[in-house]
């Protein structure tokens, strides 16, 4: 049985099934500096609350949005995936255009209906995060999007430590304290640091050196990437006496043998997800 509706604002025919549910999938990007993380929190602005506000205008029966990965306050996404179910069947391209027009900090890249079994988090087989930082003074317009590190670092040491996380390990020491997961074992497929020059937009004669850390894995614990990079920064910093061997001990002993802080959220991006 079907019910037909016509929406005046878009002149879109909407078919509402009283039996079937459609599994909608979105690929989105967002500016994390505007949000208190991706996951819904009462009385706080989050990616989930903002996105749901736009979607519910069209899909009146939305209950839950399922995100492929959870991001902290200030963390950005280039290719985050979200799915939800609804009995409403709409033209996803028109909905995408409408939301992109009215949403400043969240943009929909792709929007489509997939098979019912698809689950944004559980169906993912690989994820990629990138982390951008510089030890040079940044233009103010980049301060929310690239992390500033106040001490020079040895990039050879950074890569040596990154090589240690490749493979299957227990990353217990790098998860946020108090996290509740079935297992803290994760597999990292790729971890690398690169550097490149960025031409300052407001001064054509000036450029700054940026560093990009890329990490790919099957899944990540909450705050795992920021903690790994924070610990490596402590070791690679020019004013520290720690060595890559200390990072190895940290990983193997699964306890904090030295204090470190998570790297600032501003430089972290959920970049890609594979299914």
What are these regions (language model features)?
Residues 2-8, 12-275:
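Structured-RNA-binding interfaces characteristic of tRNA pseudouridine synthases
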